[in-house]
């Protein structure tokens, strides 16, 4: 029954639609269009659909009659149902849009109100915390101020007592931390040093079974010097080395320093070792490195040699130098191995050899200590130079090849370096009882006193001394100016020998460098330079050289040089104002007194005759003792 009813209803609706279509209720001239969601949101709430007229269905312009719109009842059920559905959809959309708009406005207003209330609550809370905190500090400050104002003396006493109590507490805490360790380690250190460190050594011996040899030979760079007692008797030796800091120093055994004088065989000067400042000293290893007073290398005529530190010493042959009957002798030796913190050396030594250096080629390995008094120790021992960064080794670490036959182990090298660094720090922290160190005592230095006195009376005397020095020829002044050695600590060095005809005053010889004097000299020298004259002479000389014919180089002839100078001799004015040097005669004449210096004059040949002068004003006989064929005498006069 229900199925029949449904079929009947569908048939009825279909028949109505088809009847209306056939009857002409749906005219093709128009269609229905509903409003969209955007038109509803924009405010267009028209429910009825608007017809869309087709362009071809519009009435002709000639037809003036208009047909009235069809009635709603004349439409078909399909059109009515479509219009009803469109109307319901538009009304639902309108109601939904209005509801969503009202809900969003309400939510936005609620969010703003909640946000405003939260910000106000947070601000009130923060200001409450600030007020409470500031109130506590303000109250505390007022109480402290009131207390200090009322009880000033009592408050000051309490503050002082609090500071003292704090210091006492910190001192007691530090003492309680370090005192047990100190009390426990001190006896162990004493026992260790008594058992192992204080070994008995004797200062020289000949090794049984070792056959060495000796040859006359001077030390490299004259770096080995003799140490003497005050009465001039022999004491030992010291060695000059070049440190990594750039200065020279003396290395010797520590037991050779007391009452010793460094003596030079070349110059004969003596410098007491008490004037040397130790930068490293070790009584346990029996070695000292000392830096001397100013110009001590020149007084002793020594140069700094290279050396090898303890971590790079290997086994192999070596040599050492001694002084026998006023001549240096080189003796053979062999580096054998290690003996605790020393190096065992096979060599034959005798009394007075202490401090002499053992050399490998031109490198110093160490200094002689002596030999141990232990059983089965048939060798001498050598004190080595430890590696001290910045002094005996560079401050940086670099990679190098391993030493073949290395003497010391890594543990021994580290122990030597640790002891050396502690000794250097101890010397750096050293302060004498008077509060002054050797390097800071300028007032007792006689050289400093002479320099200070010469610096006070500089202005008037320096100009006259400068003029006189400029007028003196360099060769003459080199022969006549021999500076005297100043006394050192009350012991004067032997005076230098001169010919007695020195034209330069004493103050000019030992005048210290002063800024004002140098400025005055430079100003005077620059003022005397005539640049225009120099330019003219240069141009003339260059033009004459350019116009001169090239010389023919005749090779294979022996004898004198056949040169002809067609140019007239021109005397150019020296910048320093000194007159032109006179030509030195080539014939042998009376030899002058040799200057008191160990350094030869610059540009001076050690042997043979001097070169011919560039311009010879008159002919002279050439030197008779020259080798080769003697040419005929020729005249050479001025052009």
UniProtKB/Swiss-Prot annotation:
The keyword RNA-binding applies. The chain crosses the membrane at residues 121-141, 144-164, 172-192. Its EC number is 3.4.21.-. One of its GO terms (biological process) is proteolysis. It comes from the Viruses. Keywords: Hydrolase, Membrane, Protease, RNA-binding, Serine protease, Signal, Transmembrane, Transmembrane helix. The active site is at 255 (for protease activity), 286 (for protease activity), 354 (for protease activity). It is an enzyme of class 3 (hydrolase). Belongs to the peptidase S39B family. This is Protein P1. It comes from Potato leafroll virus (strain Potato/Netherlands/Wageningen/1989) (PLrV). The lineage of its organism: Viruses, Riboviria, Orthornavirae, Pisuviricota, Pisoniviricetes.
